[in-house]
Amino acid sequence: MTSYNFKTQTSFPLLLSISFFFLLLLNKVNSTGSLSFSFPKFAPNQPYLIFQRDALVTSTGVLQLTNVVNGVPSGKSLGRALYAAPFQIWDSTTGNVASFVTSFSFIIQAPNPTTTADGLAFFLAPVDTQPLDVGGMLGIFKDGYFNKSNQIVAVEFDTFSNIHFDPKGRHMGINVNSIVSIKTVPWNWTNGEVANVFISYEASTKSLTASLVYPSLETSFIVHAIVDVKDVLPEWVRFGFSATTGIDKGYVQTNDVLSWSFESNLPGGNSVASVKNAGLSTYAA
């Protein structure tokens, strides 16, 4: 288990203040392009989500990203769930960039807390994004090398330290075009506990911040980096979750998302494509 210093944690009330501040920023933007949704829980065959590989929604309304058989998580599993409508993250005509906030809750539970793998990520990628490698690649990368053509920004919640591209111990990280994070902080994962996550991107400062709170512990873990999404991402993207379990026997965990909300503003833009034209007939119930 990784040790922590005070700089990696902050109080729960402070986290709420940070969250409220970014919500105010979004509400003050005069914008014709916005996207807002909330899933307090999920529904099987959710019409506004694209499910890839092992991802599904259970009868209890949980977004189960990786495979579970008879209550036991499977190895070598990969699942992703994306918001179906393409999202305009920046405007090529005006040069404007969207600010956004997203929050979600998840549970990672492992039969053996000493052999967890591999993790869960929130990510933005090209509209035609498809699942890539299992295990440490978290389903969003195909190798450990930086590649500008990947056009991916992600926040990872990594439960297994891969020697070639991870820091020691479980960690949160911000990834730009590579599984090697540009910034990480140690993360004191708690087996089977609900984690509440808040991620914000402020376009004017290019500031990407992710916070994770275990409500029962009233502490949080925060990672922050400067990311120019206009330089990294295409104008239109899809976004959502990806998760994997380990390749080696016994290195498994559940990767379950309980709820999800998102809000964005793009000054002068469209922000989101018409749901009618987003290809939802393929995924609708």
UniProtKB/Swiss-Prot annotation:
- The residues listed in the UniProt record as binding Mn(2+), with positions renumbered to this chain, are 156, 158, 166, 171
Which positions carry the signal peptide feature in this UniProt record? 1-31
Q: In which tissues is it expressed?
A: Strong expression in seed. Lower levels in the flower, and the bark of the roots. No expression in leaf. The lectin accumulates in the inner bark in autumn.
Q: Tell me the organism.
A: Robinia pseudoacacia (Black locust)
The UniProt entry's sequence similarity note says: Belongs to the leguminous lectin family.
Q: What is this protein called?
A: Bark agglutinin I polypeptide A
Superkingdom: Eukaryota
Q: Which PANTHER family match?
A: CONCANAVALIN A-LIKE LECTIN FAMILY PROTEIN, LECTIN
The protein's UniProt keywords, in alphabetical order, are: Calcium, Glycoprotein, Lectin, Manganese, Metal-binding, Signal
What is this protein's function?
N-acetyl-D-galactosamine specific lectin. Bark lectins are storage protein that probably maintains stocks of nitrogen during dormant period. Self-aggregatable molecules that can bind their own carbohydrate side chains. They could also play a role in the plant's defense against phytophagous invertebrates or herbivorous higher animals.
- Assembly and partners? RPbAI is composed of two polypeptides, A and B, that associate into five different tetrameric isolectins. The A4 combination is the only one devoid of agglutination activity. Isoform B4 displays maximal agglutination activity.
The residues that the database entry marks as glycosylated are: 147, 188
List of residues binding Ca(2+): 158, 160, 162, 166
- State the Gene Ontology terms under molecular function: carbohydrate binding; metal ion binding
Query: Pfam family of this protein, just one?
Result: Lectin_legB
Q: Which Gene3D superfamilies match?
A: 2.60.120.200
